[in-house]
Amino acid sequence: MPYVLQQKETEQIYTTTLVNHYGLAYYGVKFWIEQEEANEQAYAYLESQAVQDPDSWQVIEWEESEMKISNVKLKNSSVWQLFWSGITRKPEVRKLEI
């Protein structure tokens, strides 16, 4: 199961540029495979990315299919922000306001 970062108040999911197993860069959901690893590394990762208030983020568990559909909705573009409702268990994307 993938474990992802969610902002507690806004329900935003942490997205960034990643590299797939083919060595290709893509824009998607930052994830860990193991819960223990996610819990241990999340805070330091957020700090390394200069995220303000890393304490406002939590690790949540997703189904693999939920992560896949969320990455598709991001359209490999950083102009989209991803939000996740634990009630509906569906992703919502919003265009980044500049």
Question: Over which residues does each language-model region extend?
Answer:
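A short beta-strand micro-motif
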Residues: Y3-K8
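Short, flexible N-terminal segments of the mature chain
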Residues: I13-Q41
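Low-complexity intrinsically disordered segments
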Residues: W32-I98
